[in-house]
Amino acid sequence: MLLTQFQHIGRSLFNRGLVSSSSGNLSIRIGDKLIITRRGSNLEALQEKDLVETGINKNDRSTPLASIELCVHRAIYQNTQARAIVHAHPPHATALSLCEKSISSDHLKDFCGLGPVPVVGWGMEVKPGAIPDVIAEALKDNFIVAVYGHGTFATGQLMDEAFNFTTGLEEACEIVCLMKSMGAGQSGGK
C-alpha cells in the first residue's frame, strides 16, 4: 500500500514533467520516523528498495541511503505539522523563482486555493547548512514554497495533498509565464 502511494505520486510527477529521472524526492512521517525516497532513485519507477526508513531526529544505518534532501525533510517534520512532503523541480515555478520574491497570481487561488508562495533564498544571505531551517520556517505558514532556482517543497497531511499543491502551483506558473511571453502586464502589452 505504501509503495503503491509513492509509485503513483512519483510516476505522476515524472509524467507531468515536474521531475526528471533522478530528481525530486518524496517522504512521509510515521511517528518519530520518516520514509523517504532513496538517493538517486527514479521517481517514475520506484521499487521497494527505493524507500528508506530513518529517524526524524537522529541518524541510523539507513541514513546514508536516503535522499540528499533528507536534512530538509527532517527540518520540515521537526518544525511543522506536515505528514508528507513532495520535492519537485517544476520548470515554470522554478523559472519564476529566479525573478520573483514571491509567486503570486489570481490563478494560484483558482488552481489550488493558495495565496502568494514565498521564494526561499531570493536575495537572502543564508549561512552554509542553514537552508533546511529557512525552508522549514517558511512552511510553518505555507503549504508550499519555491526555492530560488531549485524547485519546490510542498507539504500536506497526505502525499496526495502535497502533490496537488505542487501541480496547482506549476499550472498557475505556466499561465503566468505564457502571459509574460505575450507581453501581458508589460509595457506595450494589452
What positions do the PLM features span?
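Glycine-rich flexible loops
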Residues: 1-190
